[in-house]
Amino acid sequence: MKILFTLCGRAGSKGVKGKNARDFLDVPLVWYSMANIALYMERYGAADDIKVVLNTDSEPLKDLVRRVKDVPVTIIHREEHLAGDRVPKVAVILDSLIKAEEAFARKFDMVVDLDITSPLRTVQDVKNAIERKQQRPEVEVVYSVAPSRRNPYFNMVKEENGFFCKAIPSNFTTRQEAPVFYDMNASIYAYSPDALRNKEHSTFFNSNCDAVVMKDTGILDIDSEEDYELMQVIAKYLYENEGSFKETFTKANSWK
C-alpha cells in the first residue's frame, strides 16, 4: 500500500504563538508525530511504500523536521492563500497530496494526517486508523475520537431566548440511557485520496465517515498557554507510566 503521511502546521497561531515549533517536555512538539511515524514504519510498514511531507510556512518548523534523519520528510512550502485563519485543514491536506504526487511521481492509496499539536497519541492509535480504513474502503475518512465526558441529551445546555435548556430535549434521567457521543480529537485522519479531490471541504465530515477510539486524554487541545502547561503535566505522567506512550517519548527524545 502507498501511504502518504502529512504533517501540517502554519507559522501563525492565535492561541499559542508559534506552537507548532515549540518544545513539549523539552522535545520539539512535531517530533512526537514523527516518532509515531517512525515506530509505525519500523513495526508495521515493511510491506508499504511510505512517504512523509510537511506542509508549512514556518522556517523554524522546517528546520526542526530536517534535523530528524530517521524520518525523511519532503517539505512543501505553504502558499499564502492556504495560511489564513479560515482555511479548512482539508484544503491544506489536498494541497499536500497534489504536490506529493508530483514530487514522487505516483498515486497514493491513503493519506494519513497526524496533527502536530497532538502529542498524546500512540503508534497503536495510528495502526488502528490505517487498518480501519483498509477494512472499510467505502468510507471516505477514518478519524480519531475520544469518549465524550458530556452528552447533549443529558448534561449539556444551551442559551435560548434568555433561558438555559438542554441542548437536545429528552426524557433521559441517566447518562447511560442517552445515545453515546464522542469528541473528534483531531489527532489522526486516514483519508481516501479520491475523497480529498472530489468532496466539498466545508461538509467533508457530515457523511460517509468512520472512527477509531483513543484514550480520553486525547481530547486535550492546545489553544492557550494554560492548555500547554496542563497537557505537559498529563503527558509527563503517561510517558513515565504507560508503555505505549513512553515509547513515543523515548523515540522523540532520542533525536535531541
Give a label for each model feature.
Residues M1-K17:
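N-terminal nucleotide-binding beta1-loop-alpha1 segment
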Residues K2-L7, V30, I37, K51-L54:
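Hydrophobic targeting segments
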Residues I3-L4, M110-V112:
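Structural motif
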Residues L29-D49, D63:
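A short, N-terminal amphipathic alpha-helix
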Residues D48-V53, T217-G218:
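Short active-site oxyanion
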Residues V53, D57-M110, Q124-E131:
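Short phosphate-binding loop-to-helix
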Residues D85, A91, M110, I116-S207, ...:
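Conserved core of the sugar-phosphate nucleotidyltransferase
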Residues F181-K256:
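Conserved alpha/beta core of the MobA/IspD/sugar-nucleotide pyrophosphorylase nucleotidyltransferase superfamily
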